[in-house]
Regions:
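A conserved amphipathic helix/loop scaffold
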Residues: 1-177
Length: 177
């Protein structure tokens, strides 16, 4: 199938069954911290509740990160040599796992929280899911100016730290000094 060609993993029809994914305890699944369910995510599982008429199952790959409740592989990882293939068979992949996969791929990680973060074209914005201290790690020393609530002063730094209220959005202009 086109999906198999794209991801380099053999998929198989899994028939009717649960879409909830139970994580296996693989190190890539570490760092999930939900005190209460968020969009169906808890620290050990994610995905939709209930049964669905058709599912695709991942292979018994090099690494099975998660399984459907009936034991069928649902989140798999395979080293393809120059790249890594990941198959996720259920919606709602937790941000912590996505962040760990990005880290594995060598991507810069701006924040280790599950807040929404947007970066591009000279702007970085963080929308806080929860209240508390926040930190944005920049890829290098950059000139930073807060756009909405700041005093307009610029500073050069490789880390932006601030306290945020739940659901507060902070927007920063960044540029090479």
């Amino acid at each position: 199938s086109a999906m198999e060609s794209l991801i380099g993993q053999d998929l198989a029809p899994a028939g009717r069954g649960p879409m909830r994914v139970e994580l296996t305890g693989d190190p890539l699944c570490e760092g999930l911290r939900y005190e209460e369910p968020v969009f169906g995510m808890v620290a050990t599982s994610y995905g939709l509740e209930g049964e669905y008429p058709e599912r695709l199952a991942g292979p018994e790959a090099e690494r099975v990160l998660g399984r459907f409740a009936d034991g069928v592989p649902a989140l798999t990882l395979r080293d393809m040599g120059s790249w890594v293939s990941v198959y996720n068979g259920s919606p709602g992949l937790p941000p912590g796992i996505l962040r760990n996969l990005a880290r594995l791929a060598g991507a810069h990680i701006y924040s280790d929280t599950d807040d929404a973060l947007y970066a591009g074209r000279g702007v970085i914005a963080l929308h806080a899911r929860t209240a508390g201290p926040k930190a944005i790690q920049l890829p290098r020393q950059l000139r930073v100016r807060e756009l909405l609530d700041g005093d307009g002063r610029e500073r050069t730094t490789d880390r932006i730290e601030f306290d945020a209220s739940a659901f507060e959005t902070r927007v920063f202009e960044v540029d090479v000094p």
